[in-house]
């Protein structure tokens, strides 16, 4: 039976879930983001461990240009006096299907929003109230709109 899912938050977790639902199910879904747009500033880098890469590869992350990602071989650890404590050989965790990866957060968000951006994403949707009804969940937003869904996934770090 087809269900209706509300995903709260258009960050990495929310957009990843939206892509997976779109690819593997016929459920109806919508991503609600409280901000007016996605932050795509070049900004900071993130690290993705092997298990997260395996999940992302299910939605074609492995097609991202190698110019936009980096596969470090080791990570060095330092104490507060800037003295090296040890290093970790990351290549030992890599496999043919997934490698430890670093990239800019904006690159990952750009990739994740490609297939869902206009049709499945609503901006400026600040939640005012969530009410559990008999067999549904009612979400009320600050803009006086609402949505009645079967499931709510909180993927917003400030929810």
PLM feature segments, named:
Residues 3-5, 22, 49-159:
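Conserved N-terminal helical subregion
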Residues 1-13:
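Beta1/beta-strand and adjacent pyrophosphate-binding region of the FAD-binding site
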Residues 22-42:
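Glycine-rich FAD pyrophosphate-binding loop
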Residues 8, 32-33, 155-156:
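Active-site flanking residues adjacent to catalytic metal/cofactor-binding acidic residues
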Residues 16:
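Conserved SAM/SAH-binding loop-helix junction
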Residues 45:
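Glycine-rich active-site loop/strand segments that organize a redox cofactor
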Residues 13, 37, 159:
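Conserved Rossmann-like nucleotide-cofactor binding loop
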């Amino acid at each position: 039976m087809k269900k209706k899912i509300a995903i709260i938050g258009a960050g990495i977790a929310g957009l990843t879930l939206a892509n997976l639902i779109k690819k593997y199910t016929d459920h109806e879904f919508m991503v609600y983001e409280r901000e007016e747009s996605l932050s795509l500033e070049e900004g900071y880098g993130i690290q993705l461990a092997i298990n997260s890469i395996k999940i992302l590869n299910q939605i074609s992350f492995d097609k991202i240009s190698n110019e936009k990602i980096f596969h470090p071989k080791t990570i060095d650890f330092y104490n507060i006096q800037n003295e090296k404590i040890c290093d970790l050989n990351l290549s030992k965790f890599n496999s043919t299907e997934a490698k430890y990866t670093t990239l800019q957060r904006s690159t990952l968000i750009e990739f994740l929003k490609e297939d869902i951006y206009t049709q499945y994403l609503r901006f400026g949707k600040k939640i005012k109230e969530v009410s559990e009804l008999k067999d549904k969940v009612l979400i009320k937003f600050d803009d006086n709109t609402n949505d009645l869904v079967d499931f709510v996934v909180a993927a917003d770090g400030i929810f």
